[in-house]
Amino acid sequence: WSERVLVITDDYEIKGFVFMPKTGRKSRLLSDILNSSKRFVAIKNCKLKHRNSANRVTEAHDFIQLNLDSIVLIRPALQEE
């Protein structure tokens, strides 16, 4: 299953889907992914908005790998976002 998320970094606002595969009987939660030993999180079907650009250009990407150290805020996206 996947969860739609909003991610804020110093330079970008990212909206996309984090896929959380089942491991055994327990479904992985977003916090499990963020606290794992992996240093990157995969985000699919995402839109990146440049936060510091005057015209706030938005880019669409099928897939990005985001370094966890660059995340300022991450949360499930709201329906209206």
Q: Whereabouts are the PLM-identified features?
A:
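Conserved RNA-binding domains used in RNP assembly and mRNA/RNA metabolism
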Residues: W1-E81
